[in-house]
């Protein structure tokens, strides 16, 4: 079962608030299915309905297990673009939604199926 450190989730929520009304996006780093950090890539473009990652800056990092991004709309469900990205970029993906409280998130696997994410 996947878990996330509370401080990491708080950081994601604060970054999402700071980016509002634009989307925030980053990659997730984990060890033994515990997400402990985010990786923000230089050149990431934040828009009102999208986040574009410059993957040339990602490098090879085997601790990167998936992605996180915000939905300023308040709906933490994947769009068609999210579903496509999930299948290509990792094992776990998190969508956080406005107003960005600790409970305003949903986790998904690479098939866009909801999965449990325990907060540590």
Region spans (language model):
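Conserved beta-strand-loop surface patch within small alpha/beta domains used
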Residues: 1-64, 73-120
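Cys-dependent condensing catalytic cores that perform Claisen condensation/acyl-transfer
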Residues: 67
